[in-house]
Amino acid sequence: MLGSIPVLVNRSGSDSNKFQATDQKWSYTDLQSDQTKLNLSAYGEVNGLLNPALVETYFGTTRTSSTANQNSTTVPGIGFKIPEQNNDSKATLITPGLAWTPQDVGNLVVSGTTVSFQLGGWLVTFTDFVKPRAGYLGLQLSGLNASDSDQRELIWAPRPWAAFRGSWVNRLGRVESVWDLKGVWADQAQLAAQAATSSTTTTATGATLPEHPNALAYQISYTDKDSYKASTQGSGQTNSQNNSLYLHLIKPKKVESTTQLDQGLKNLLDPNQVRTKLRQSFGTDHSTQPQPQSLKTTTPVFGAMSGNLGSVLSGGGAGGAGSTNSVDLSPVERVSGSLTINRNFSY
């Protein structure tokens, strides 16, 4: 779906067709002797071509230090970090809050606000990826076996990805996305206020944030949150696992054949399924899940056009210019536009 959270397609199947972890390993010694053996783009490169504009826009900014004896430094955005010592056969895709290790990453493509790259047997796509947004979504691999869910973690940050609502096309034909940033910030503000007035020394943290009601509205995989909670070791210390409800371990649905995968994606993109998911996401299907009252608003923020998101949600289609159907899109702003779905996918 256009504007969705990353769609991760796993090349699973029989042993002869499954992507093998051995296909992704590389040797640090080989890397030192022959850089071409590492199928990674260098920092600031897109498919092997250095593009200064893309480096500035997507990959980082250059800052000049106020100290006279210090040179200008580049603040990294998205790039690849090669290990400096022979103690780790891994490469890290770096940016504030994002890290993929230790898989072989290649074919990085930046197009508009979309970032796509191949990660082992996965195709990872970030849509509506805009640098100024505060908040990150990442895929972290802790092992070399891409088929082992225990070694693959999809990391959620409180914003903006956990609050994604959907995409539409504005009057200029540009794709826009609806985000409920206010909802997450309201949760944080409420927790901070409670902590400030509390007689205890407890501090509100991201781990105490409730799960956003639409965090998984567009996720085709399912989530096992219990597998990603912190556990207490015998010494009384908590291990390094993060127990934030925004950090989830994603277990892709098992796919036995490409036919099953094709059918599953067709079912996912079925208009009726999309309407149902959107109704649930916007809270317009009389769901039993409570919606924060403080987030409700009916302020139009975009001009009308021939098709509108409300008519799609209500089953009226995208072409009813004279339709008077209206759907309450609380707790987000009411918008007008066409819901766009991209049926193209790769595996």
From Swiss-Prot:
Composition skew (Polar residues), residue ranges: 282-300
Per its record, how is this protein called by name? Putative adhesin P1-like protein MPN_099
Similarity comment: family membership: Belongs to the adhesin P1 family.
Signal peptide location in the record?
A: none
Segment Disordered: which positions? 282-302
Q: Which Pfam families match?
A: Adhesin_P1_C
